[in-house]
């Protein structure tokens, strides 16, 4: 049984560029390694898993598993434990990347990783928090509990989409991070998800502490994607929580 599997959380608010950055890391992974990606989506119908698997094509050395329907440690907590166990004990990868939903609570994800069930099998490394510097102009983002928790538990802040930002926005992000988290938290700009593997292999500085309470999310425990399509050939699913709402459609390829 493999022990000390390196695991990184790649977090960030909605639209920060998490999936693009994970694809960049996968492109740079060693050819002889198997990686597992655990994707969590706020909506009942997963999009990020489809984006990752679609980009990878028929790639047997990357396993992508999904926990849909809300924060993986809230309503989907049981599903996360089952899926993480499957990754550790069946897949036994060389590395695990976890992408929580942009409305998720990564501190609770980290608490799960430190549970007795998993901790001897995992080597918990840096948490990468991705922030689009332009989002600092949006008060509904900067005041959101999920955004603040993502920043507070960061080991490294990635300023995404710098090609779309001006110098003042990049500087404002660095000053904002320093004022909230201190000057020791590094902030680096990365374009088009071009992350280096060197950003991963640093132990996390995270320590268990009081967390921001999660807002209950309306979500069925049963994964929507597993429901059979009716004769009409499509399903519609809705989910809401933390002030956001999603609507997803799943349509048969035959329709």
Predicted regions and their residues:
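Active-site glycine-rich loop that binds ribose-phosphate moieties when present
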Residues: 138, 142-147, 160, 171-173
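C-terminal accessory "lid"/substrate-recognition subdomains
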Residues: 149, 165-255
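A broadly conserved amphipathic alpha-helix scaffold signal in soluble, globular proteins
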Residues: 107, 111-114, 155, 175-178
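Conserved beta-strand/loop subsegment of P-loop NTPase cores
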Residues: 36-37, 96-97, 122-131, 151-163, ...
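Short histidine/acidic/glycine/proline-rich micro-motifs that form metal-
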Residues: 136, 163-164
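Nucleotide-state-sensitive switch-loop elements of NTP-binding domains
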Residues: 2-11, 16, 20-140, 145
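Short glycine-centered, acidic/aromatic-flanked micro-motifs in structured strand/loop junctions
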Residues: 12, 100, 160-161, 251
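Flexible, charged surface loops at secondary-structure boundaries
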Residues: 30-31, 151-152, 255
